[in-house]
């Protein structure tokens, strides 16, 4: 199973409240058969409007693995394409003030932790990243804390989400594959799956 215990790397500050899923990935990109390639279209309209000055276009953030956002990130329609686009771009964790519930659940289902902290700590982190884009940001899920430079602050995520990530239980498909033997053994014991054999 894919355990998620710690994510460390460069970070990308995305300032603004109520950034919805239609901004994250515009509706015209939802017709894809697979999620492959969605990363290049993340924030497509915002990036076009800002003419190359959007944080997702700036060269200093191109290898960032941590996204730092503000309040109510991922609100709007419940499209799984939104977290998938962020993931395919290269983000592995999101730190913010708050998240829309469905977006948060979709991220968890893909092994991407979304943790929260008060506005002041998020703003300080965003400013620190802007001042030094090479700043290493570490999210430790075992201690539920973020560390950067000589600073550290606690973050919040539900006990259930934390345990799922630490144990690797977020990966439902992986669990099914890993437990195929147990599933088959249980199926053998269920009479309604073998009614034709029983009747004979």
Swiss-Prot record:
The keyword Amino-acid biosynthesis applies. One of its GO terms (cellular component) is 3-isopropylmalate dehydratase complex. Gene3D superfamilies: Aconitase, domain 4. The keyword Metal-binding does not apply. GO terms for biological process: L-leucine biosynthetic process. GO terms for molecular function: 3-isopropylmalate dehydratase activity. PANTHER family: 3-ISOPROPYLMALATE DEHYDRATASE SMALL SUBUNIT (PTHR43345:SF5), 3-ISOPROPYLMALATE DEHYDRATASE SMALL SUBUNIT 2-RELATED-RELATED (PTHR43345). Heterodimer of LeuC and LeuD. Belongs to the LeuD family. LeuD type 1 subfamily. NCBIfam families: leuD (TIGR00171), PRK01641.1 (NF002458). Catalyzes the isomerization between 2-isopropylmalate and 3-isopropylmalate, via the formation of 2-isopropylmaleate. This is 3-isopropylmalate dehydratase small subunit. It comes from Synechocystis sp. (strain ATCC 27184 / PCC 6803 / Kazusa). The lineage of its organism: Bacteria, Bacillati, Cyanobacteriota, Cyanophyceae, Synechococcales.
């Amino acid at each position: 199973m894919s355990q998620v215990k710690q994510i460390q790397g460069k970070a990308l500050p995305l300032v603004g409240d109520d950034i919805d899923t239609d901004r994250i990935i515009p509706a015209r990109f939802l017709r894809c058969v697979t999620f492959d390639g969605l990363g290049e279209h993340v924030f497509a309209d915002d990036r076009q409007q800002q003419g190359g000055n959007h944080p997702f276009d700036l060269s200093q953030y191109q290898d960032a693995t941590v996204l730092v956002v503000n309040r109510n990130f991922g609100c709007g329609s419940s499209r799984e394409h939104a977290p998938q686009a962020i993931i395919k771009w290269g983000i592995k964790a999101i730190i913010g003030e708050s998240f829309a519930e469905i977006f948060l659940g979709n991220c968890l289902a893909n092994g991407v932790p979304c943790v929260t902290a008060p506005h002041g700590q998020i703003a300080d982190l965003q400013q620190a990243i802007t001042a030094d884009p090479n700043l290493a940001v570490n999210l430790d899920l075992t201690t539920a804390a973020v560390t950067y430079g000589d600073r550290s602050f606690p973050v919040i995520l539900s006990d259930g989400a934390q345990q799922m990530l630490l144990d690797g239980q977020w990966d439902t498909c992986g669990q099914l594959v890993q437990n195929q033997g147990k599933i088959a053994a249980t199926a053998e014991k269920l009479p309604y799956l073998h009614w034709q054999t029983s009747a004979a």
